[in-house]
Amino acid sequence: MGAFLAVLAEVFDLASITGLSVESILSGEALTTAELLQSHINNLVVYGGLTEAEALAAVEVTPQAFAALTSLFPNFPQALGALAATEFTATGALTVGAAVSAALYPYYWDYRTPVADLNMALQIWYPDLDILFPGALPFARFVNYIDPANWAADLYRAVGRYFWERVQAAGINFIEQQMETGRELAMRSVTSLSETLSQYFENARWAVSGLSTSLYHGLESYYSQLGLSPIQQRQLARNLGHPQPYRYDLYDAPQLKGQVSATYVTKVDPPGGANQRSAPDWMLPLLLGLYGDLTPSWKDTLEELEAEEDGSHSQKAKRRKTKA
C-alpha cells in the first residue's frame, strides 16, 4: 500500500511540475507529449543551431518540466496498473484470511481462553458522574468554560454575550411587533376612512344641477327684470311730463322671483323595514370603489384610461428618442 501511495505522490508532483493533468499522465498521453517535445527540442538544436537551454526558452518550457517529462518511461501506465492490481490482490487476500481466521477461531463457553484476551478494553470505563452526583457535569462544563487565571474577564465576556444575545432577540421581536402594529393600524385607518366617506356619501343630500344652463337663465332673468336707474327714471318722467318721483322711492326695486338652481334627489327609505344600508344605483361605483371593489364597467373605464396614459407616455418617449 505504501508503494502505491508513493507512486501516486510522484504522479501528482509530475503533474504540478509539468502542468499536465493527472489523467493524462495515468492514461499515457503525457508520454506522447514528452516524445513530441523531445523531438522538437532536438530539431531546434540540430537544425536551428540553438543550445538546449535556448531551445527550451523558445518553446517556453522550464528545464525542470522537461527533465520530469523525459524521466517518464513508456510502460509507466501499465506498471502503475500492475502495482494497483497487486496491491488490491494482497489487501483482499489479507482481509479474507483475517475474516476466515476470526470465524474459525475456537471459542468455548467454559472460558478456557481468558476473557481479557478476547475483549480487550481500549480505555477504562467510568460511570457517568450525573448518576452518582446529579449536576456535576454542568458544573464541570461551566468550570471548563471559565479560565481560573482570568475568571473575571471570562465571566464578564460570558455575561455580556448572554446579555447581548437577549437584547438582540428582544430588539428583533420588538421591531417585528411594531411593524405588525403599524400594518394593522394603517389597514384600520384606511378601512375607517373608507367607511366614514361611504357613510357620508350615503347620508348626504344630493342635488342635480346644470351649472351652465342655470347661469345663462339667471343672467337673462336678471337683466330682463332689472329696473331703470334714478337718472333714467327722472329723464323718463321729465319727457312724459309726469312729476318726478321721490328720490327715496327710486330705490324700491321690485323683488325678483326666486330661481331654482338645482333639483334635490329624493331619498328613499331602505326597503323591507330592516333599516339596512342602501344607496342609489348611480352611487354604487363610488361606494364600491371606496371599499376596494370595482364594477365591470368602471374597471373597463379605468383600463381604457391607463391604456391612453401608457400610449401617451410611449409616444413622448419615441419623440424624445427621435429628437436625440
Swiss-Prot record:
Transmembrane segments: none annotated. GO terms for cellular component: host cell; host cell endoplasmic reticulum membrane; host cell nucleus; membrane; viral capsid. A motif (Nuclear localization signal) lies at residues 311-321. Signal peptide: none annotated. Residues 315-324 have a biased composition (Basic residues). Residues 302-324 are annotated as: Disordered. A lipid is attached at G2 (N-myristoyl glycine). The keyword Mitochondrion does not apply. GO terms for molecular function: DNA binding; structural molecule activity. Keywords: Capsid protein, DNA-binding, Host endoplasmic reticulum, Host membrane, Host nucleus, Late protein, Lipoprotein, Membrane, Myristate, Viral penetration into host nucleus, Virion, Virus entry into host cell. InterPro entries: Polyoma_coat_VP2 (IPR001070). One of its GO terms (biological process) is symbiont entry into host cell. Belongs to the polyomaviruses capsid protein VP2 family. This is Minor capsid protein VP2.
